[in-house]
Amino acid sequence: GLWEKIKEKASELVSGIVEGVK
């Protein structure tokens, strides 16, 4: 569903930010 896609994109975004901070 749409919510699953939103959560998936949010997880990718958070992961990208975390990797950028490291």
Curated annotation (Swiss-Prot):
It is found in: Secreted. The modification Lysine amide is found at K22. Keywords: Amidation, Amphibian defense peptide, Antibiotic, Antimicrobial, Secreted. The keyword Repeat does not apply. The keyword Secreted applies. It comes from the Eukaryota. GO terms for biological process: defense response to bacterium. Expressed by the skin parotoid and/or rostral glands. GO terms for cellular component: extracellular region. Antibacterial peptide, that adopts an alpha helical conformation which can disrupt bacterial membranes. Each caerin displays a different antimicrobial specificity. Belongs to the frog skin active peptide (FSAP) family. Caerin subfamily. This is Caerin-3.2. It comes from Ranoidea caerulea (Green tree frog).
